[in-house]
Amino acid sequence: MSPHKIPEVHRHIMSSRYMEGNAVSIINMPFSGGQPKDGAELAPEMIEAAGLPEDLERLGYSVNVVQNPKFKSRPLKEGPNQALMKNPLYVSNVTRQVRNIVQQELEKQRIAVNIGGDHSLAIGTVEGVQAVYDDACVLWIDAHADINTPDSSPSKNLHGCPLSFSLGYAEPLPEEFAWTRRVIEERRLAFIGLRDLDPMERAFLRERSITAYTMHDVDKYGIARVVEMALEHINPGRRRPIHLSFDVDACDPIVAPATGTRVPGGLTFREAMYICESVAETGSLVAVDVMEVNPLLGNKEEAKTTVDLARSIVRTCLGQTLL
């Protein structure tokens, strides 16, 4: 059996504190403009074709698939800050659409399952969630902090910058992103899985006292204790909605081989699933992002392994259990 194949076991819907029904919207986000490698835009269609909607229906959910949105095409002329960051107008146009779509689906009392695509899309997903749940906390699972500003980013790729917009660190805002705003405070954000940070990201995490658990912490304390500490910090008493943003590169390359910025020494499959199980147990999940699957960065088997991992992440945070 594939390590990610859905087993013939008991399944049940996550008991939600915030949603009236048992409905989810899978929002496909075929976009790779926040980084230089082609392929991430193919992931949503592949994950859907592999059976994600059917997975969630078997769990008991009413599933709506927001078919690939008609994202605005790459502009013929980029914005005035092209020298400061790559594809700023293109990324801005798409993430603004993403914000609106996520907000609309949440307002329909549907859990937003956001399938990317690269992680620059979180500029929009975080704003969309906060527009409906302005006290939501964000659990960011990633090898990277994605907290660079356009000024501090060594690569100038915007998939490494989404949280700088959400936290207000990118101010004064580039003209292309004048629509964004600070929507979360540091006390409502926690990282798990970090192991590759740029110098300015280290400074932000230390100086702003942002809760961040590296792979050293996972090794030292174990994943159960790390998740418990992270949730207690950002969601004391479990009174806040949770937005889980999961970059598959948080996992070890053996677990997630088809992704763009692989870093050795990541989460095991079970550690990744434990995070998702813990989120499901809170009953507080309102949105989940699964980002940076890139089927072109690996052979057929590696692409399938990573696509199946994405399905497992979604199923598990929405309540799949063994018993």
UniProtKB/Swiss-Prot annotation:
Its cofactor is Mn(2+). It comes from Schizosaccharomyces pombe (strain 972 / ATCC 24843). Homotrimer. It is an enzyme of class 3 (hydrolase). This is Arginase. Keywords: Arginine metabolism, Hydrolase, Manganese, Metal-binding, Urea cycle. Binds 2 manganese ions per subunit. Gene3D superfamilies: Ureohydrolase domain.
